């Protein structure tokens, strides 16, 4: 049910060649025109009459002729997609003819409700809790498993083809039953024919029947669980609290109903039933309404009804069951739907080849400023009286390491990206640990005051201190000019700022956490402590998710306010969490602070949380908003997705709307006047507008295929292992070991022979010689280093097949199917998809002769020697390998980076971090780095 946050354009199908567009051709009757002309009516009246006539015909056409959409299957087949109805209409609308499955589903639902009146009262809650858990598992686990296999392997479609579910030649009773069911459902659809539509569409319809049963059973069991919990709970709450609970619950239920209905309005049945897992549909969706309020609204705010029922029932049992069910839905989203969305709508595109950028003078780094920028830089420094400049003119060249200008290691974000070689990282962690050790101080008034003011001062420094630095940097580039004074270029100044900001962030949270821990007391005396702890934990989780979403959207550059320090052209876009909120950190970004205040129930923590909130709002108004206005100007939006949706939904009558606007204006005036006083007090009075920040795309991880171990299968008696053999092709003889050897990363060809009655699922795996102790069975997984021998035997790992017949063939191992490290290996021929070994090749070696750097070798010569090694590392990669030593290499795929890293280790006995390799950009740069490492190691003793 999740959909990508962009309009779906399923395929590049030429609609004109496939179907007639339902264009509305409005032919105005000549009699109408003649009549108006004869009556000598004015042009204005004539135009008005014609417009009314056109509108009537347009309405008539659009209401009588439904829009037909074209679907496209994975094999390229196109078809007109028959119109479908939603789940509730199919099951409960008496005007629609019911199929047998509809009757069965409704009967099952009635049975679930009937159990309420049959079982004893004490059994109702456990029974429905078990049923809800079972159907929720069937939903997230069962449907998730089916969709995962359909997305990656088209498993459901292949099953339908394998068992001839929709084949005209199938005469079985169940085939006739399915045919009758489908024809009943589409009896009024002229575009549907059971045997003519693609198998993907019929498979999807059959899958929908299963989904209907699971989803309706899940909902019914949850509803009966909620009803049972409501009847089993007895509270002594006052009447006004009970009415308040039910009123709030009813409002949440109404919101939940609107969210689901509006989401279905946008995505239709096609996305509601995961149609794009089966075929793509030519339709453009406008993601407005509920899709502008929250990401994946059907799985996020669309579950508000769960918590409404828990509130109305006043049951912790139902509340915890709702939390578990909701959490399972997010697991389903992250494991099943998000990878499919990324693969379908955001496929990886290889980069175009380009030349690597070179630094002209290796002894210095050019900032790349033109004459105008140099003059502006001089004016910046000369215009600040606090910066004294020597008589030497301003220089735009700084003696800095090459890697600083080109690429640097990712900065420390809280504790992420920790580097043991960076002293600042070690000091940051040490400061956090040292702060938390203060927890063991005596619990008295003195240390209460000390820890309180530690937390307060850390936050004040983070918002007020760093806020002043950012404000002055935005207005006068004060921070950068301070570094320019000492000959340090802007990027280095920005790196120092990153350390400042991260240390301040860490100390803000650790000092606040320390104070909370010291204020925590056992909650045994508070009757509402379970609710407070659950809500507190949820607020903390919301805080963490918001912070991660902000970082994912902004990247390191936006997280550390990079546009305050570096002149980088940015386009202001709104995606990720910023599609829904202008300032998510304003409220959601402090949710965990209030969660801890709720859990500790301490006045001191509450005061800190209140001040934390005010400081954050002041930071946004006085620092971020003026800078964003200065940089982006009129491109800043005023209303975020949530605000716009609420405004569009709440259309009040004119008198009420006028009063609401007057009240809103009064409140805004009070807030603005208060903020203006504070602004004038600190001397930062500037006009303000709504703010927004940069957006970056969220990349999803790719999951490598893995070979699952299965049990050993005994060799049939009619198979003679002597008929099987695996022989190596090519290679060179090692002088010392007398083994065949292959150069590091070189493709290895293998010829095999087999018995005529071999299995199509036989396969060959690559292993280290001593990893498997038994010659008869392989005990370790191949981890993807295997190849099938017959294209009909496996669904994957068939790219390595060079030739294949019944008794012999040839396969090639390259790319991911190779070991990218030196050692002694062997190939094993396995029987029938199992791990029973029928033949083993002779041992061979993967070698990497050491390249000597001790002599006088120049970078160009060394680069030419490294180039073929690097090219092999790009085997079966989506990136272009470099063709020349100065070609830019796209080291973005993790597997390619790992291979280059292993190659450098093997050939030069030098270990380089992946980030360093990415910074080199070309083979020539890598060669230069290796020569610099050689020079640096001269004179050192090991």
From Swiss-Prot:
Taxonomic superkingdom: Eukaryota
Region (Disordered): 345-364
InterPro entries to which the protein is assigned, alphabetical: Phopholipid_MeTrfase (IPR007318), Phosphatid-EA_MeTrfase_fun (IPR016219)
Record-level Gene Ontology MF annotations: phosphatidylethanolamine N-methyltransferase activity
Associated pathway: Phospholipid metabolism; phosphatidylcholine biosynthesis
UniProt KW keywords: Endoplasmic reticulum, Lipid biosynthesis, Lipid metabolism, Membrane, Methyltransferase, Phospholipid biosynthesis, Phospholipid metabolism, S-adenosyl-L-methionine, Transferase, Transmembrane, Transmembrane helix
GO CC term (a single one): endoplasmic reticulum membrane
Annotated membrane topology: Multi-pass membrane protein
GO BP, one annotated term: methylation
EC number of the protein: 2.1.1.17
Catalytic activity: a 1,2-diacyl-sn-glycero-3-phosphoethanolamine + S-adenosyl-L-methionine = a 1,2-diacyl-sn-glycero-3-phospho-N-methylethanolamine + S-adenosyl-L-homocysteine + H(+)
Pfam family, one: PEMT
Subcellular location(s) per record: Endoplasmic reticulum membrane
Cytoplasmic side: 121-126, 234-238, 314-315, 444-449, 518-526, 611-942
Transmembrane segments: 100-120, 127-147, 213-233, 239-259, 293-313, 316-336, 423-443, 450-470, 497-517, 527-547, 590-610
Matches recorded under Gene3D superfamilies: 1.20.120.1630, 2.60.40.2840
Parts of the chain on the Lumenal side: 1-99, 148-212, 260-292, 337-422, 471-496, 548-589
Top enzyme category: transferase
Job of this protein: Catalyzes the first step of the methylation pathway of phosphatidylcholine biosynthesis, the SAM-dependent methylation of phosphatidylethanolamine (PE) to phosphatidylmonomethylethanolamine (PMME).
Family per similarity comment: Belongs to the class VI-like SAM-binding methyltransferase superfamily. CHO2 family.
Record-given protein name: Phosphatidylethanolamine N-methyltransferase
Gene coding for it: CHO2
């Amino acid at each position: 049910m999740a959909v990508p946050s962009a309009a779906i354009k399923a395929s590049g199908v030429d609609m004109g060649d496939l179907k007639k567009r339902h264009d509305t051709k409005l032919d105005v009757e000549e009699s109408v025109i003649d009549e108006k002309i004869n009556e000598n009516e004015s042009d204005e009246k004539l135009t008005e009459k014609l417009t009314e006539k056109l509108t009537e015909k347009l309405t008539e056409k659009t209401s009588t002729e439904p829009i037909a959409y074209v679907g496209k299957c994975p094999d390229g087949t196109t078809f007109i997609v028959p119109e479908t109805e939603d789940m509730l209409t199919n099951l409960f609308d008496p005007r629609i003819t019911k199929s047998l499955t509809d009757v069965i589903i409704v009967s099952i639902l009635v049975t679930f409700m009937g159990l309420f009146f049959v079982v004893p009262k004490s059994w109702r809650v456990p029974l429905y809790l078990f049923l809800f858990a079972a159907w929720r598992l069937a939903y997230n686990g069962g449907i998730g498993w089916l969709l995962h296999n359909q997305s990656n392997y088209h498993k459901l479609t292949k099953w339908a083809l394998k068992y001839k579910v929709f084949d005209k030649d199938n005469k079985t009773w169940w085939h006739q039953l399915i045919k009758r069911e489908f024809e009943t459902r589409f009896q009024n659809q002229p575009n549907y024919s059971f045997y003519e539509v693609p198998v993907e569409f019929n498979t999807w319809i059959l899958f929908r029947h299963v989904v209907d049963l699971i989803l309706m059973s899940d909902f019914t069991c949850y509803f009966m669980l909620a009803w049972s919990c409501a009847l089993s709970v007895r509270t002594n709450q006052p009447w006004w609290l009970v009415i308040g609970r039910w009123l709030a619950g009813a409002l949440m239920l109404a919101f939940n109903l609107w969210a689901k209905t509006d989401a279905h309005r946008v995505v239709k049945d096609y996305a509601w039933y995961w149609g794009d897992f089966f075929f793509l549909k030519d339709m453009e969706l406008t993601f407005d309404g509920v899709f502008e309020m929250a990401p994946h609204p059907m799985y996020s705010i669309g579950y508000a009804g769960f918590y409404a029922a828990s509130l109305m029932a006043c049951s912790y049992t139902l509340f915890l069951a709702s939390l578990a069910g909701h959490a399972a839905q997010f697991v389903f989203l992250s494991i099943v739907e998000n990878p499919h969305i990324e693969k379908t709508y955001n496929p990886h595109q290889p980069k175009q080849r380009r030349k690597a950028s070179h630094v002209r003078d290796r002894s210095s780094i050019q900032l790349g400023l033109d004459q105008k920028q140099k003059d502006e830089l001089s004016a910046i420094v000369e215009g600040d009286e606090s910066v004294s400049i020597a008589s030497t003119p301003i220089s735009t060249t700084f003696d800095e390491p090459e890697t600083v200008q080109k690429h640097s290691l990712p900065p420390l974000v809280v504790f992420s990206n920790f580097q043991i070689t960076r002293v600042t990282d070690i000091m940051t962690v040490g400061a956090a640990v040292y702060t938390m050790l203060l927890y063991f101080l005596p619990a008295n008034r003195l240390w209460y005051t000390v820890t309180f003011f530690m937390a307060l001062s850390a936050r004040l420094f983070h918002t007020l201190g760093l806020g002043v630095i950012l404000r002055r940097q935005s207005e006068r580039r004060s921070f950068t000019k301070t570094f320019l004074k000492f000959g340090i270029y802007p990027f280095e100044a920005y790196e120092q700022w990153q350390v400042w900001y991260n240390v301040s962030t860490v100390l803000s949270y650790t000092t606040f956490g320390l104070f909370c821990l010291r204020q925590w007391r056992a909650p045994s005396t508070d009757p509402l402590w379970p609710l407070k702890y659950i809500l507190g934990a949820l607020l903390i989780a919301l805080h963490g998710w918001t912070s991660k979403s902000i970082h994912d959207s902004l990247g390191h550059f936006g997280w550390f306010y990079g546009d305050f320090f570096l002149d980088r052209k940015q386009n202001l876009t709104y995606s990720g969490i910023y599609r829904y909120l202008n300032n998510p950190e304003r409220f959601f970004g402090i949710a965990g602070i209030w969660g801890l205040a709720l859990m500790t129930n301490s006045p001191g923590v509450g005061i800190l949380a209140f001040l934390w909130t005010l400081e954050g709002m002041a930071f946004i108004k006085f620092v971020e908003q003026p800078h964003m206005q200065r940089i982006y100007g009129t491109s800043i939006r005023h209303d975020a997705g949530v605000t716009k949706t609420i405004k569009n939904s709440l259309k009040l009558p004119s008198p009420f709307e006028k009063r609401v606007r007057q009240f809103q204006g009064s409140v805004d005036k009070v807030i603005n006047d208060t903020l203006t006083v504070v602004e004038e007090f600190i001397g930062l009075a500037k006009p303000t507008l709504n703010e927004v920040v940069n957006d970056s795309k969220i990349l999803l991880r790719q999951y490598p295929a893995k070979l699952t171990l299965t049990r050993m299968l005994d060799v049939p008696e009619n198979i003679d292992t002597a008929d099987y053999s695996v022989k190596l092709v090519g290679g060179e003889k090692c002088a010392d070991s007398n083994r065949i050897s292959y150069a590091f990363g070189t493709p290895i060809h293998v010829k095999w022979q087999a018995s005529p009655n071999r299995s199509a699922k036989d396969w060959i795996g690559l292993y280290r010689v001593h990893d498997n102790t038994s010659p008869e069975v392989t005990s370790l997984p191949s981890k993807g280093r295997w190849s099938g021998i017959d294209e009909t035997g496996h669904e994957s790992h068939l790219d390595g097949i060079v030739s294949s017949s019944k008794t012999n063939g040839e396969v090639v191992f390259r790319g991911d199917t190779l070991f990218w490290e030196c050692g002694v290996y062997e190939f094993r021929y396995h029987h029938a998809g199992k791990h029973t070994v029928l033949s083993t090749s002779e041992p061979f070696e993967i070698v990497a002769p050491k390249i000597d750097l001790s002599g006088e070798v120049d970078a160009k010569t060394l680069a030419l020697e490294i180039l073929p090694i690097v090219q092999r590392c790009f085997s079966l990669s989506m990136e272009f390998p470099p063709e020349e030593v100065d070609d830019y290499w796209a080291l973005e795929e993790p597997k390619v980076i790992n291979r280059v890293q292993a190659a450098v280790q093997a050939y030069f006995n030098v270990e380089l971090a992946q980030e360093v390799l990415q910074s080199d950009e070309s083979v020539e740069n890598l060669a230069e780095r290796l020569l610099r490492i050689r020079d640096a190691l001269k004179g050192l003793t090991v």
